Design a protein with these regions (language model features):
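Active-site phosphate-binding and catalytic loops of NTP-dependent enzymes
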Residues: 2-3, 53-56, 67-79, 129, ...
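G-domain G4 guanine-recognition motif of GTPases
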Residues: 47, 123-125, 153-173, 193-211, ...
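Conserved Switch II/interswitch segment of TRAFAC-class P-loop GTPases
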Residues: 91-94, 98-104, 113-173
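Conserved catalytic-core segments of large NTP-driven translation/proteostasis enzymes
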Residues: 173, 180-345
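P-loop NTPase switch module centered on the Walker A-proximal segment
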Residues: 3-106, 115-128
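C-terminal effector modules of nucleic-acid-centric enzymes and ribosome-associated factors
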Residues: 11-18, 164-167, 181, 312-438
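Short acidic, glycine/serine/threonine-rich loops at helix termini
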Residues: 44, 130-135, 167-171, 204-209, ...
Length: 438
């Protein structure tokens, strides 16, 4: 029986790894997979046969376990997020492996959008220290700012390559103190620090004998113990993605509304409101995936993809949203949002954009750039009128027609969107709604 089969159903932790180029991220992921026995025998055989300039003697180059991503980067292929899966006796994990290069910041946003936690990797040898004060790299600040923008629940700062600084407690403390200052500036509250050597395996799965001064848990133990908050008990948000008929014909009496429950829960017999029409109806049936197919269930909750059938005949189409009846939810046309800009062509009020939020797509006009984050100083420039690639800024938008939304902090599923350039069809930005009004 595999380790995954032995795992109790304690839920899944999704986390991202973020670090500058050559911080040892691939080796860290490889070490987690290898030491948690998540490497298949054929992968292990290939690893033992592979030798390159980074290996010494019988050492395994664990970074090769993620070298598919590196090979793509070297060939100039557009990099997407690579997902890795492993499990221990306590938990299942999904790693969103994002590239470290600055030009791939957009891919980190993609990976972080569904994550519960982030591992921020810092190379202990690349941080300059003057008079006991460490100067963190700009990418570390950028990654941390994105983690804050996307409201990830937990941050683990893995200070790597401790073997190359003689496992120095002083160096660890200098970097930790610098990051504590950064975290306070950004408003990150749940931050944990682990000194590691991914290459040697120190403090990855087991405690390191070479750092007796560190009294905390190794990295894997921290990951296993992180609490995961769900939105199952929040207000219902169910964007309708598809109107389904049993046989596809217009004469078919069956009509089900398919989509993903972004937050809250729904039960058979609940009275829901359909927005934006505000018509009410009763949930007659919920159909959900089960092993071997689908089945009617009495109850469904956030994160599940389901089909809902209503008792009353009401007009529902793609882009509508089911909410709890009586809840004061007003569609919005004016938004204030934080944008992470992805495209080489800067944001411009003169260009036409489409805003895609849940299952709705509407035209959006840029009202102006209110501020842009300087990742070097963590200050906000208010004299900028455009966003360039990898910029993070606060922007005002006016929509052609209203959408049903929430602030990102309240409901990430309905508070997030992407912007699409109408002319190029490029996805140019990810947005997080901070304020909205009619």
């Amino acid at each position: 029986m595999s380790i995954i089969e032995n795992t109790e159903d304690l839920g899944v932790l999704r986390f991202i790894t973020a670090g500058s180029v050559d911080d040892g991220k691939s080796t860290l992921i490889g070490r987690l997979l290898y030491d948690s026995k998540a490497v298949l025998s054929d992968q292990l055989s290939a690893l033992s046969r592979a030798k390159n300039k980074r290996t010494v003697g019988d050492e395994l180059d664990l970074a090769l376990l993620t070298d598919g991503l590196e090979a793509e980067r070297e060939q100039g292929i557009t990099i997407d997020v690579a997902y890795r899966y492993f499990a221990t006796a306590k938990r299942k994990f999904i790693i969103a492996d994002t590239p470290g290069h600055e030009q791939y910041t957009r891919n980190m946003v993609t990976g972080a959008s569904t994550a519960h936690a982030a591992i921020i990797l810092i190379d202990a040898t690349r941080v300059t220290v003057e008079n006991g004060v460490a100067d963190l790299l700009p990418q570390t600040k950028r990654h941390s700012a994105i983690v804050k923008l996307l409201a990830l629940q937990h941050v683990i700062v893995a200070i790597n390559k401790m073997d190359l600084v003689d496992y120095s407690e002083a160096r660890f403390n200098e970097i930790r103190d610098a990051y504590v200052t950064l975290a306070k500036q950004l408003g990150l509250t749940d931050v944990r620090f682990v000194p590691v050597s991914a290459l040697k395996g120190d403090n990855i799965v087991g405690a390191s004998e070479r750092m007796p001064w560190y009294a905390g848990e190794p990295l894997l133990d921290v990951l296993e113990s992180l609490p995961v908050e769900t939105q199952a008990h929040d207000a219902l948000r169910f964007p309708v993605q598809w109107v389904a008929r049993q046989d596809g014909s217009s004469a078919d009496d069956f009509r089900g509304y398919m989509g993903r429950i972004e937050s809250g829960e729904v039960k058979v017999g609940d009275v829901i409101a359909v927005l934006p029409s505000n018509r009410t109806a009763t949930v007659a049936e919920i159909i959900a995936p089960v092993p071997g197919g689908t089945a009617s269930v009495a109850h469904a909750f956030a994160g599940q993809t389901v089909t809902i059938r209503l008792a009353e005949d009401v007009d529902v189409s793609r882009g509508d949203m089911f909410v709890t009846s009586g809840e004061p939810v007003a569609p919005a046309k004016k938004l204030e949002a934080d944008l992470c800009w992805f495209d080489e062509t800067p944001l411009s009020p003169q260009r036409k954009y489409l805003l895609k939020q849940t299952t709705s797509t509407v035209f959006a006009k840029i009202g102006g750039v209110k501020q842009v984050l300087d990742v070097h100083t963590l200050s906000h420039a208010t004299d900028r009128h455009e966003l360039k690639m990898n910029d993070i800024g606060r922007v005002a938008l006016t929509l052609q027609k209203p959408i049903v939304c929430d602030t990102y902090d309240a409901h990430p599923g309905t508070g997030a969107f992407v912007l699409i350039d109408e002319a190029t069809h490029h996805t140019v930005a990810a947005g997080m709604i901070r304020e909205f009004s009619a």
